[in-house]
């Protein structure tokens, strides 16, 4: 499916082409402004979809971290009980209960499990930070800085970033930061560059009312897509649409200058329509990658589950570790896939 915003931009340029043969035609001038409004609303809509998806991902991340912290605290509490029970020659039921919770934690993020001689465990992140050790747990937090989500671990010297969380939470971080925020940043850049080029041509031209120096579009820097609008000086005012480069009736050089923007390369590369379609293509590639990663991890899960069921009476530590890693990969891939499919369907107008 074609990206709706790219279609709307194309329709605007087509309307300008129709106006160029009769630049004073009031009906065609109104049509150009109507198409410009369509472009603006489409940019705002896409930004809104991305913004809502980011809010949803952040909310899900915070909920899952709350549940994760409860599990981590429970592991630490059980370890305190396990240490005493093991010293007295028991503790198997407590260990089984704790291990089930460790499995849940491992689905949420990458952790290495180090078994202690006293029956307790140490849970260590991929970058070497202890979450649980010696019956003590550290708090995991979701932080947001300049729109970017990250996970941190509490410490005596302050919160420390978890570089590679992995698992379901790692998938959510990727979906938020790399996919949704990345697409929004690209969309903002394209919107701002497009408006800037169109405004340069429009402000140099004259409307049929004889005035000049007016922008066609307005936007807020850094939020170009969500704030994109037809400038108030032109909106709903066909006579204010600049078509003449000289002020003379029948001249269309200002209109032609705006039409030239269609095929001109923007600073970020490619034309405006190519750039918007590029965002669509990037989301499509992300979906394909997530599906492939999920299928690979699911295959590993099936193999390891079968192995775990068929082998008895031997140490299964390595197999269980591999199984947990496969679960993490599957969870991460599915989180990215779910979020990206929602954005792809909505932004690229499969549901509009």
Map each language-model feature to its residues.
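S/T-rich, low-complexity, solvent-exposed segments of bacterial secretion/appendage proteins
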Residues: 1-352
């Amino acid at each position: 499916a074609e990206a709706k915003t790219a279609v709307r931009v194309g329709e605007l340029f087509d309307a300008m082409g129709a106006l160029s043969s009769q630049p004073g035609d009031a009906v065609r001038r109104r049509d150009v402004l109507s198409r410009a409004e369509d472009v603006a609303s489409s940019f705002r809509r896409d930004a809104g979809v991305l913004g809502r998806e980011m809010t949803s991902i952040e909310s899900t991340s915070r909920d899952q971290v709350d549940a994760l912290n409860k599990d981590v605290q429970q592991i630490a509490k059980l370890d305190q009980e396990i240490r005493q029970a093991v010293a007295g020659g028991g503790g198997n039921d407590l260990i089984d209960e704790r291990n089930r919770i460790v499995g849940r934690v491992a689905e949420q993020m990458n952790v290495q499990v180090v078994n202690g001689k006293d029956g307790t465990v140490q849970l260590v992140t991929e970058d070497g930070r202890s979450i649980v050790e010696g019956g003590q747990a550290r708090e995991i937090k979701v932080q947001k800085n300049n729109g970017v989500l990250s996970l941190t671990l509490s410490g005596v010297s302050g919160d420390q970033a978890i570089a590679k969380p992995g698992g379901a939470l790692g998938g959510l971080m990727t979906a938020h930061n790399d996919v949704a925020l990345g697409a929004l940043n690209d969309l903002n850049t394209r919107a701002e560059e497009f408006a800037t080029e169109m405004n340069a041509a429009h402000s140099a031209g004259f409307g049929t009312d004889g005035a000049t120096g007016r922008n066609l579009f307005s936007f807020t820097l850094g939020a170009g897509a969500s704030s994109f609008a037809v400038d108030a000086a032109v909106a709903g005012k066909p006579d204010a649409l600049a078509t003449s480069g000289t002020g003379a009736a029948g001249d269309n050089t200002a209109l032609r200058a705006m039409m030239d923007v269609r095929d001109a390369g923007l600073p970020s590369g490619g034309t405006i329509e190519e750039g918007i379609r590029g965002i669509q293509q990037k989301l499509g590639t992300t979906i394909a990658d997530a599906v492939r990663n999920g299928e690979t991890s699911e295959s590993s899960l099936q193999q390891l589950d079968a192995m775990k069921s068929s082998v008895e009476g031997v140490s299964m530590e390595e197999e269980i570790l591999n199984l947990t890693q496969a679960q993490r990969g599957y969870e991460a891939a599915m989180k990215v896939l779910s979020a990206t499919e929602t954005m792809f369907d909505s932004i690229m107008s499969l549901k509009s």
